Amino acid sequence: MPRIKLISWNINGLGGMLKKNPLGGCMNAAEARIQANVLETLVRQEEPDILCLQEIRCTEKTQWMPMKYTYTNYNQTSRKGYSGVLVATHLAPLSVAYDLEGIEEKEGRVITVEFEDFFVVNCYSPNIGSRRLVYRVNVWEPALRRHIQRLQQRKGIILCGDLNVVPTDLDMNLTKTIPGATEEERKAFHQLLDETHSTDSFRYLHPNTRQYTWGGLWMRQKGQGARLDFFIVPTSWAEAGVINRSEMLDYRGSDHIPIVLGLAYSK
């Protein structure tokens, strides 16, 4: 039975992450030459088959290849220091596609990688708040749903990344409402799950757990934060017991923490 491990992490800038030690602190040049950074430590300790990063903020391909993964694909923005996603893997992709049909802005927010048994859609949804709520709900979300539905006609889909949405009140503990927690954005998220017959893997395995993927250090110390990062998988996979792990990992260096998905499925 094949076993696949995926990790997703909004790293809030690849350049800065490569200078962080495993505790999230900044390293000087001398330390960086002799000590593994937090991203290298994560990859070495967890050994993901597929690594999905968001908000890499690279305008051109970085020389850093994650632990010499065989295949590394980027979708980069033309705007310096903004957005960008990356998928690194030891598995040979069959195809790679960028962006979403119907979305004119080229912000490097989506990359779709096809493997033998499934697609991985690595996504960094826009955090736009009330100023562009209409765009988020009426343009971005429908385009993402259509993209998933088209791919589903061929094989299963793993949608992962920072989707910038708080599905329920169980998924946040904050003193004020943040973008992503509006009624409209929540409705769009659940519409995606319903119309694509998909499930939130973490919530499926941990229906009552309060745990958060986003929040600064001072927020974490107070038990505050929000769950903005997800692995969305076919409901049929969840019901068949294909998901054997979906949880958060304690690695620092970003305002997000990484999440991991473990799959065990029959060929």
Regions found by a protein language model. Give the residues of each.
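Active-site-proximal beta-strand elements of phosphoester/diester hydrolases
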Residues: 3-18, 117-130, 160
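Metal-dependent phosphoesterases centered on the DNase I-like endonuclease/exonuclease/phosphatase
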Residues: 141-228
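Surface-exposed cleft-lining segments at the edges of enzyme active sites
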Residues: 26, 101, 125-141, 173-178
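Structured beta-strand-rich core segments of catalytic domains in phosphoester-bond hydrolases
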Residues: 56-128
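Active-site beta-strand termini and strand-to-loop segments that position acidic
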Residues: 89-90, 113-116, 223, 234-235, ...
